[in-house]
Each structure stands twice: as C-alpha cells, then as structure tokens.
C-alpha cells in the first residue's frame, strides 16, 4: 500500500497550470505497517500452550482430546493475546475453527493489535474460515489498532469475493481507518480498478475524503493517471472539492501533466453544460 505525504512548499498564486517545483507531490513506494496482506503470526513452539499449538498445526484429534479433558481454556490467550481461534484462522483450518466454535469459544475476541479472528482470516486470505465466522455471528465492523476493518483488509488483498461476503453481513462500506481511508479510497490508492468498480456498484461514496481531505479522484491522480481516473469521472464526482491545502482535483490534474489536466477540465465543462441544459 502506498503512503501519501502532503504537498510541500507554498501554493502558487497565479492561474498557471504548468508543473511547479513549489507544489510537488511526494509519494513513497513502501507499504506502511498498518495494513498488509498474507502475513500469518510469527510463532515459537516453546511459547505455545497445548491448545494453541494444536490449533496452529491443525491437529483436530489432539484438540478434541484437550477440550474433552476440560482442563484447557478454549479462550486462553498467549503472550500476544491470541486465542486458539486466532491461530486456526490465520492458518486456514476451517475444521478447527468449527470445533472451537462448537466448544463455545469467543468469536469477537481481539489480540494485542485488536485484530479479531475474522480480521486475521481476511488478512491471511482464508475465505472459508471467514465464512464460518460470519455464519456464527462474527462482527465485520470491529477495528484493529489502526482502525482498519475486515473490509479494509479484503480490499487491500484485492479479494472481491471476500469483500462481497463481508458486505452481505453488513460491513460498513464507509468505515475510515486512521489515515481516513474508506475501502474505496484504499482501492484507489492501491490502483485496483476492479475493486474500485465493485465498490462503486455497491454504493461507495465517491466524494468521501481522507484525513487530508483528499477524495478518490485526487488520490487517483497522485498515484498516476490511470483508468481509475476515467472511471471516477463517470460518477458524480465533486471536482470543486478542496483538500486541506486548498487544492482541487483540477489542480491535482495540472500537476500530473497538460493532457490529464485537459481531460479533467473537459469533463468538468461537460458536466456544467449538462447541468445548465437541465435548467
């Protein structure tokens, strides 16, 4: 996931739309630690309790034996507040997930980073585990320490199937993480056109803005002139909206080159003409 930094320098005071070193856009190419996909837990066998270890390696028989003895807590936590359910979900053991649920484990429990088993299943691309959790009442709107929901992780993982399933279970389409990114803004930042299309069809707010008041069209123009720009322009995009530095989408376009600037302004003029004709 790319990280966006504010414009540096002073804003130009004239009406020129040429490139200016006074308003460059800085874009880091590395992913921030707040949101990543595919990462399971880093575990050390010697630190694992018996129930946790059985869940981690998917040993159903041992898990049954431990649970039948009733001397092991199905909701027991390790040093990082992870339960056996967290570990089973991270490793994709649907049978273990079902067994733990049958034995009354807590489903919406959070680890040391506030990640629920559902968030962990989505983060690790374990759709079958996520499905079982949702069927048994997992809350898709709980957030981790960075305020990411399971839907944010599904978007980051480019998993439309999982995103759709989460929305079927009332996931909040407009939830914002600590960067102010809704799932749509995140999809645009990741330059994932298929996910952008999907979220727009589901009714995502095209004019939602991040903590710097940047809308989807602005973020698309920062990433690079992409097909997502054209897609967003087909929506009811507010081109007059200003970010915290006072820049509009048209100015973002001008920073990225003359051609893209005219693509935006031409679309804006067409919208104005359409509105005038309507009256």
Curated annotation (Swiss-Prot):
Residues 1-11 have a biased composition (Basic residues). It comes from the Eukaryota. One of its GO terms (biological process) is blastocyst hatching. It comes from Mus musculus. Residues 1-25 are annotated as: Disordered. This is Ankyrin repeat domain-containing protein 7. PROSITE patterns: ANK_REP_REGION, ANK_REPEAT. ANK repeats lie at residues 80-109, 113-142, 146-175, 179-208, 212-241.
């Amino acid at each position: 996931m790319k990280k966006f930094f504010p414009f540096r320098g002073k804003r130009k005071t004239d009406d020129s739309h040429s490139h200016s070193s006074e308003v460059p856009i800085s874009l880091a190419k590395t992913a921030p630690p707040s949101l990543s996909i595919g990462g399971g837990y880093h575990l050390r066998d010697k630190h694992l309790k018996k129930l946790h270890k059985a869940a981690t390696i998917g040993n159903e028989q041992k898990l049954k034996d431990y649970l039948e003895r009733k001397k092991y807590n199905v909701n027991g936590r390790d040093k990082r507040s992870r339960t056996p359910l967290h570990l089973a979900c991270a490793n994709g053991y649907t049978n273990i997930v079902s067994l733990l649920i049958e034995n009354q484990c807590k489903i919406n429990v959070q680890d040391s980073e506030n990640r629920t088993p559902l968030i962990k299943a989505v983060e690790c691309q374990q759709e079958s585990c996520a499905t079982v959790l949702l069927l048994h009442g997992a809350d898709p709107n709980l957030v981790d320490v960075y305020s990411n929901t399971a839907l944010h992780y599904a978007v980051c993982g480019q998993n439309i199937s999982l995103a759709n399933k989460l929305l079927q279970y009332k996931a909040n389409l407009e939830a914002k993480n600590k960067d102010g990114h809704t799932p749509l803004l995140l999809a645009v930042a990741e330059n994932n056109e298929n996910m952008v299309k999907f979220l727009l069809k589901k009714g995502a707010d095209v004019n939602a803005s991040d903590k710097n008041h940047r809308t989807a069209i602005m973020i698309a123009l920062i990433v690079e002139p992409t097909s997502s720009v054209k897609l967003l322009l087909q929506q009811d995009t507010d081109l007059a909206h200003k970010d915290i530095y006072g820049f509009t989408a048209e100015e973002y376009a001008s920073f990225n080159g003359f051609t893209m600037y005219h693509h935006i302004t031409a679309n804006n003029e067409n919208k104005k003409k359409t509105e005038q004709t309507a009256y």
